[in-house]
């Protein structure tokens, strides 16, 4: 009853974006309007008073483009993404996705909660990566599934993913929300929330790839990166964290200066 009620709620509160002119990114809304997994997909455009623009699709809760002004005031797209829904639905990628249930790796594809062992997909070197993400034989991982649209305004969209108990091996019926808000100080606020009826694990994130050149054919070797981090978590040959917390000083992971 619980799960049926939340499914109905998600569907009843879903709404369509207001009709707008085509985004300045050059993306075509029609190229994202399709039926996938029995649900409608679309492209939603968020704007602010400064002319900044963010395009989002409800397939995987993905940020498709972020248009920002360069030093000369020219608008440029600074994230990597596809220009149509077909590529997102058929080419494995995490471009701009709202990843779940569990971003990153779970060692050996196994979790234990209250002495109950749950086997998860082992889709990456024997580990469970990004919720077991795959397109075949069936879409798995939230980044490959269609979200419901609960709310959309000029500068905000709320996307809902209803995940049934046992999906990809994870326990608990989960209702997860991803809220993207484009603020007037040119920030993108991302808020994730989730509720469940059983003890489970949740670790959501966004998976944008940035290229600040605006020209996605250019390398990013001219970028400057600063991370206020003194330590990092080393990984083994399968990219699984070892449990060690190591200093960044003297390593290629030092971006503190």
Please identify what each model-predicted range represents:
Residues 1-3:
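Bacterial N-terminal signal peptides that target proteins for export
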Residues 11-14:
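C-terminal motif of bacterial Sec signal peptides marking the signal peptidase cleavage site
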């Amino acid at each position: 009853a619980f799960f049926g009620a939340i499914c109905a709620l998600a569907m009843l509160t879903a709404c369509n974006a207001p009709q707008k002119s085509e985004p300045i990114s050059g993306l075509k809304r029609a190229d994202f309007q399709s039926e996938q997994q029995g649900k409608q997909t679309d492209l939603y455009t968020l704007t602010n008073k400064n002319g900044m623009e963010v395009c989002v699709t409800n397939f995987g809760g993905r940020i498709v483009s972020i248009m920002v002004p360069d030093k000369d005031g020219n608008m440029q797209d600074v994230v990597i993404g596809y220009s149509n829904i077909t590529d997102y639905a058929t080419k494995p990628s995490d471009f701009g996705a709202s990843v779940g249930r569990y971003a990153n790796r779970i060692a050996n594809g196994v979790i234990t909660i209250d002495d109950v062992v749950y086997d998860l997909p082992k889709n990456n070197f024997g580990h469970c990566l990004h919720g077991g993400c795959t397109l075949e034989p069936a879409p798995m991982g939230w980044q490959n599934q269609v979200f419901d649209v609960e709310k959309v305004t000029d500068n905000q969209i709320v996307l809902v993913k209803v995940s049934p108990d046992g999906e990809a091996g994870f326990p608990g019926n989960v209702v997860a929300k991803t809220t993207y808000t484009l603020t007037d100080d040119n920030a993108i606020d991302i808020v994730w929330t989730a509720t469940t009826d059983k003890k489970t694990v949740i670790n959501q994130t966004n998976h944008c790839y940035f290229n600040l050149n605006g020209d996605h054919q250019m390398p990013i070797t001219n970028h400057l990166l600063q991370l206020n981090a003194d330590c990092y978590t080393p990984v083994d040959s399968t990219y699984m964290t070892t449990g060690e917390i190591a200093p960044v000083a003297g390593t290629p992971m030092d971006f503190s200066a």
